[in-house]
């Protein structure tokens, strides 16, 4: 059977946008957007009419209709508390498991966005996560969470590698050190601010291997208790559903 090599090659190098893979190509995304008003984050702009209070197009609107938890103009949340900049930028961990009871009133995001996942509590406490690379949450290294050292930023820290703060290597701008840099804030080099009242540097305290192993055991026990609670919750749901069907089935026979 003859094969048109030119036709096959043209299909492989085709620039058709519909052939490109992407998260917005999932079949369940239209259902999420139409039924619940949330879905995957895209570059679609927010609907101006919806932001002002009402959009006549409803779910058929081509623009985004963010949930109330993502609207930053409100002064209070559903719980009556002041809005949190952290809550409005993190994905709800219960939503990912299908167990969020707050629904549209949840203070966290109900969407699938790996870049907005909350920080893994297990990894943040001991640097260990039993899920490893399969964990859906962010693994932030302890060194990245440390504040920068003011002494090091000004040129020298007497504690060196023992300092409890982060030493970020930056190249000082020679023009700024001399007195004036024509690039100003757009300069690619560092422009340190010289402060007269710097806090004294402190020595970093490292945990022993026994302390780390104890924290890992506590994390494993906590995760096992959480799995047990989820199993009990699902079993109760299942028993309740079968009970309802059993009652209706019994009435029909009588």
Curated annotation (Swiss-Prot):
Question: PANTHER family annotated for this entry?
Answer: CLEAVAGE AND POLYADENYLATION SPECIFICITY FACTOR SUBUNIT 4, CLEAVAGE AND POLYADENYLATION SPECIFICITY FACTOR SUBUNIT 4-RELATED
Report if keyword Repeat is assigned: yes
Keyword match Metal-binding? yes
Physiological role: Component of the cleavage factor I (CF I) involved in pre-mRNA 3'-end processing.
Per UniProt, the ranges with Low complexity bias are 68-84
Cited InterPro entries: CPSF4/Yth1, Znf_CCCH, Znf_CCCH_sf
The UniProt entry's GO CC annotations, sorted and at most eight, read: cytosol; mRNA cleavage and polyadenylation specificity factor complex
Protein's gene: yth1
User: What Pfam families would the database entry show?
Assistant: zf-CCCH, zf-CCCH_2
Into which family does the record put it? Belongs to the CPSF4/YTH1 family.
User: What SMART domains does the database record attribute to this sequence?
Assistant: ZnF_C3H1 (SM00356)
Zn-finger segments (C3H1-type): 42-68, 91-113, 114-142, 143-167, 168-194
List the Gene Ontology MF annotations in alphabetical order. RNA binding; zinc ion binding
Q: Which UniProt keywords apply?
A: Metal-binding, mRNA processing, Nucleus, Repeat, RNA-binding, Zinc, Zinc-finger
Put simply, this protein is called mRNA 3'-end-processing protein yth1
* Species annotation: Emericella nidulans (strain FGSC A4 / ATCC 38163 / CBS 112.46 / NRRL 194 / M139)
Where in or outside the cell? Nucleus
Q: List cystine links.
A: none
Disordered, as annotated region: 65-84, 207-254
